[in-house]
Structures are given as C-alpha cells and as structure tokens.
C-alpha cells in the first residue's frame, strides 16, 4: 500500500523544521497524516475566462477540509489568446502551455502534495494542467470556470447571438459604421467565462469529460449559473475520496494514467470530431498522451476522422449556436450518448466519478436517464445580465432540446455530415500531415485548387488581405510560423476573420505551419508538418504555384514535379531554412529556449531533450 506522498515532509523527527513551516500555514497536529490536496488555480484579472476564479479555489478548499483533507492552493499563469492575438504576444501562448505544466509539477513535487484539483478554463491552461496531471500521475479532478454567455446585439432590426469573432469580422468590414462596430464590441463578451463558441478553451474543457477526468457539465454549463457551483463543491469532496482510495486502499484504478488510457484518448478525439472542436485540441491531446506515455498519434486521429460523423455544429461553424445551446441539448454527455448508440465509443473506460463511462451515460445522458435532477441541471440557462461574478444567476430554460433529428445535437442517422468535423490531410507539402476543421468548411470548397500567395509571416498576410491584394481563387500560404519557426506557433484568427470580412471565406484557402484559433472557420489548413523551419516543403512553395486540396480524399498537393522540388530544396538548404525577409519580431531568450527543444505540430509540439 503506497504511503501518502506528503508523509515525506510531515513525519519523522528530522522533519521538525518542515512541520514548523506547515504549522505556519495553519496546519495543526491532527492534520499531519491527512492527504494534502493541491488546489491548482489559474485566477488572473487579465483573462475573462479566469477573472471569476479568485474565490473558487477557497470554495473547493473548504470542501476538501470538510471531507478530511488538507487543502493548499497555488496559482499558475494564464494567457488570453484573444488579447495576445495580432501582435508578438501570441508568440508566448503555446509556450505557456509547457510553462504551466512545469509550474504545476514544480509546486506539487516540491511540496509532496498527494492529489490535485485543477481549476482551469482557457486555451493553454487546461492543456498545461492536463499534461502535468499525466506527468505526475497522482489523483486529480478537473473543474473549469465555464463558458461565457453568448452576446446579444440588436442589429438592423433583428436580435442575434454573437461572440468575439463576430466583433472581429465586422470591425474589418467597411460596410459597418463605427457605431455598429462599437455595439458589437460592447456586446460580444458580456460575462466572465471562456469565449462562448466551440473554440479551443471550451473544446478542451469538453474533452476532459470524455477523458473521464472531470464531472458531467464541466464543458457546457455557463460560468454564471448557480448550478456550476455544484461542480466545484463536488470536486472538493471527490478528490479526498480518490486520494484515500489510492493511498489507503491501494486502488490505482483512479490514477490519471489508469483513466486516460489510449481508449479514453480515442474517445476524446471521437468527441472532438463529432462536435467540430478546435484544431488546437489535436496539439493538446497529442501532448497529453505523450506525457501519459500513451501511443496516440496522428494516424489514430486520421483513422477516427474517416468514420466519425458531425453530430453538433457550434459557433464558429454555426454562428447562432453557442455552448449554452449545447448544454440545453444535454451537453457533452448527450453527444457521447449518441456516439455510444452509434457504436463509436469504448464505454468500458473508467471515470473519476463513475466506475465506467457507460455508468456515467446511464445517469447523465438526457435521452436515457429519467432523473429529474439531471433534466433540471441541463435546463440551466444564461442569465442575460453582464457580470464578472460566478454563479450569479439561477435562470432555467422551460424545456430541454431533445430533438435528435433537427436539434443542436443530432443522432448519427441525422448527422450534419457523415464525415467528421476534423480531417488529417497528407501530401507532398505535408508529409507528416496537417489539420483542417471540416465542420467550418463550406461544402462547395471541400475540393479546391488555387494559386499560392506566399507570406513569410502572419503580419505580411494580414497586410495583404486588408490591402485587397488577395483575390478569389488564391491560396494564402503563411510559413515560418510553426512551433520552432515562429517561434511559438501563432494562431491565425485575424487572417481567417479578415478573409471572411472581405467576402472571401468561401473563395480562398489558407495553408500554414502555424495554427488556428478555435474561432477560425473556412478552408483553413494548419499544423503543416514538417514546418518550414525544419525543412518542410511548405518552405519551398513559390508565388504562382498551384495547390490542390481534396478534403474528401484527405490530400493536399503542391503541383510541381519531383525534379523541381528537389532543385528548390537544394537551393533553400544552401541559404538556410529561415524567412526570405527579416521580420520585425523580437524573440526573447525564453522563446529561443522554447524553439530549441520543441517538436513539430504532428507530435503535439512537445519538448524533446
């Protein structure tokens, strides 16, 4: 039977000094011997998805104490991708994922904590904490801050639901007046929480449900609803139970690596494909699997993408549907339930809250349960009042959305499309693969042939788009923006949003070794691997080349012959793999260190030492 890890610093005469310091934090004689639970918070006033988390750590801590544990809270950093977008701040976003994972490891191991509750929410914070959980392999429960309510704007006689991306699109569209743009800006982000569509933050918080590491509703119930408080209270109680099961009953089945097995990672990716999640989830699941020593690769994602249908379309794929609508339809447990009925899941896998995923679905899927409390939980609605306060309203929808034929969540028979919401493409421009969010691609351009317009940075591409230099039929190629070449693998939300604002969303493609925001839509192909900085063929594309994209057949091809490709490679290798023009970009020592050790997107941009 394993000893509590914390015993290292709480027992024995030689630990008198350490106990003295523990006492100075408030511990008493009776606390030595109880499990010490790290409450890993990520509160910051910089990020709307985290601005309401300040007191929630202590809410969890109180439940831990009441359940017989000792709670010790600490904080990680949190970068807001939306605020960092469009300038050099975005260079720091993906590297912050590794920094978060390391900081959690440092704090937990330095102080010999026995278990963790991870309070996350936004883009790189949930993945960073997930990587740490897999690395440490001690009992853990994830609970996120929850989605923001969708914005509402009265526009030219109609009221419509909007989000951050809508504000960006109208700002770049000259047909909108300054007053109209200002109204969208003021209305797009009305409350605390992660941005309201199926963007990266919400995608990842949904995937923790599929991985079995968080409670039902974690990914979908809005941050402002009083029922979300129940998740935090339950997380505090549950983590003490899990810690005691492992350390006192020798039950290793509740450890993260026992729960997040390859089958669980495949379940999570299946969910992601079915709900049209952010392409960034591919990076993060690959990275988490790497930490868990699970053999989960791009080949697995490719195989799943060919047989999993799209069962839900949420903004940005469907602009009038947001996370609050997904919750009303039964949330992630409802999507998982439909996938189970289509025999697309392994429901034998365990979760932190039920013995198996099947047990969880029997209890929480609104189609199969008869529990009125579950129905009420999923009727939790937005409050419609701007606020930065968690759990500040208690409004309910009058009915659930159980329509699986035409509703927000469909069954497999009535899927939005039989092909999944994500696809892996291969070809001579991406030998190790690239990713496209097919749920956001119009059917008319699933096959697209266009003329390359090559840019050595996102900034140069944005300037060309706003300068009306990009025309219908162009393929915008943005390179040297990968994990190493950026460094930091910037998101390309501005280029995709500006293409949409120029009326080119269905007439152009964008191909990059960078990545896309979860808010991106259109024919946006990212994660091209190998990246240009590693000698990838994207670094050999020239203006005027023809690029063929065939999503149904999963291919992307640069139309030049092998001899021309070989000649270009010889010339480029002599020059070195770097942008043709010097970029106005300050790369700090911290970013240079990141670039030295990171790998390609096809491997999750994980560190190799």
Swiss-Prot record:
Superkingdom of origin: Bacteria
EC number of the protein: 4.2.1.9
Residues bound to Mg(2+): 81, 123-124, 491
Cofactor note: Binds 1 [2Fe-2S] cluster per subunit. This cluster acts as a Lewis acid cofactor.
Cofactors named for this entry: [2Fe-2S] cluster; Mg(2+)
One GO biological process term: isoleucine biosynthetic process
Coiled coil: none
Annotated GO MF terms: 2 iron, 2 sulfur cluster binding; dihydroxy-acid dehydratase activity; magnesium ion binding
Cystine connections: none
InterPro entries named among the record's database cross-references: Dihydro-acid_dehy_C, DihydroxyA_deHydtase, DiOHA_6PGluconate_deHydtase_CS, ILV_EDD_C, ILV_EDD_N, IlvD/EDD_N
NCBIfam families (UniProt xref): ilvD, PRK12448.1
UniProt subunit comment: Homodimer.
Record-stated family: Belongs to the IlvD/Edd family.
Name recorded for this polypeptide: Dihydroxy-acid dehydratase
Lineage, uppermost ranks: Bacteria, Pseudomonadati, Pseudomonadota, Gammaproteobacteria, Moraxellales
């Amino acid at each position: 039977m394993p000893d509590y890890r914390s015993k290292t610093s709480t027992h024995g005469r030689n630990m008198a000094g350490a106990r003295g310091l523990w006492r100075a934090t408030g511990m008493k004689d009776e606390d030595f011997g109880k499990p010490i639970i790290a409450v890993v918070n990520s509160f910051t006033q910089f990020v709307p998805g985290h601005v309401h988390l300040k007191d929630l750590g202590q809410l969890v801590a109180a439940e831990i104490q009441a359940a017989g544990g000792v709670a010790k809270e600490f904080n990680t950093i949190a970068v807001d991708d939306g605020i960092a977008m469009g300038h050099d701040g975005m260079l720091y976003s993906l590297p912050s994922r590794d920094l978060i994972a390391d900081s959690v490891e440092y704090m937990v191991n330095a102080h010999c904590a026995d278990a963790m509750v991870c309070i996350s929410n936004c883009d790189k914070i949930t993945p960073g904490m997930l990587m740490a959980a897999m690395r440490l392999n001690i009992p853990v429960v994830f609970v996120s801050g929850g989605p923001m309510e969708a914005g509402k704007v009265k526009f030219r006689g109609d009221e419509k639901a909007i989000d951050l991306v809508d504000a960006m699109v109208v700002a770049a569209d000259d047909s909108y007046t300054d007053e109209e743009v200002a109204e969208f800006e003021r209305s797009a982000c009305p409350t605390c929480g992660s941005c309201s569509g199926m963007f990266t933050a919400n995608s990842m918080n949904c995937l923790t449900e599929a991985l079995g590491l968080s409670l039902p509703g974690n990914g979908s119930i809005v941050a402002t609803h009083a029922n979300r408080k129940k998740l935090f209270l339950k997380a505090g109680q549950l983590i003490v139970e899990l810690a005691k099961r492992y350390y006192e009953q020798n039950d290793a089945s509740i450890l993260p690596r026992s729960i997040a097995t390859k089958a669980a990672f495949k379940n999570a990716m299946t969910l992601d494909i079915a709900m049209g999640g952010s392409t960034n989830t591919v990076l993060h699941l690959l990275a988490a699997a790497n930490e868990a020593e699970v053999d989960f690769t791009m080949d697995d994602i490719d195989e799943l993408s060919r047989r999993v249908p799209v069962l839900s379309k949420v903004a940005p794929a469907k602009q009038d549907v947001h996370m609050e609508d997904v919750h009303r339809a039964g949330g992630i447990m409802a999507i998982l339930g439909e996938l189970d009925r289509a025999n697309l899941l392994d429901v034998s896998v365990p979760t932190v809250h039920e013995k198996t995923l099947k047990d969880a679905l029997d209890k929480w899927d609104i189609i199969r349960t008869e529990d009125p409390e579950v129905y009420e939980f999923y009727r939790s609605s937005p409050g419609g009042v701007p606020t930065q306060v968690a759990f500040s309203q208690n409004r309910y929808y009058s009915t659930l959305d159980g329509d699986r034929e035409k509703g927000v969540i469909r069954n497999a028979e009535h899927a939005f499309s039989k092909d999944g919401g994500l696809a892996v493409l291969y070809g001579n421009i991406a030998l190790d693969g690239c990713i496209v969010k097919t749920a956001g691609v119009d059917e008319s351009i699933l096959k697209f042939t266009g003329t390359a317009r090559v840019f050595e940075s996102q900034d140069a591409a944005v300037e060309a788009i706003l300068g009306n230099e990009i025309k219908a039929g162009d393929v915008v190629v943005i390179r040297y923006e990968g994990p190493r070449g950026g460094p930091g693998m910037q998101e390309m939300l501005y280029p995709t949003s500006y293409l949409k604002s120029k009326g080119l969303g269905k007439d152009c493609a964008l191909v990059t070794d960078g990545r896309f925001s979860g808010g991106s839509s259109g024919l946006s192909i990212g994660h091209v691997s190998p990246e240009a900085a590693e000698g990838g063929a994207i670094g050999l594309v020239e203006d005027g080349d023809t690029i063929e994209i065939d999503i149904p057949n999963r291919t992307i091809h640069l139309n030049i012959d092998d001899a021309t490709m070989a000649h270009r490679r010889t010339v480029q290798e002599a020059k070195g793999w770097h942008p043709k023009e010097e970029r106005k970009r300050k790369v700090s020592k911290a970013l240079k260190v990141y670039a030295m050790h990171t790998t390609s997107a096809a491997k999750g941009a994980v560190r190799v030492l």
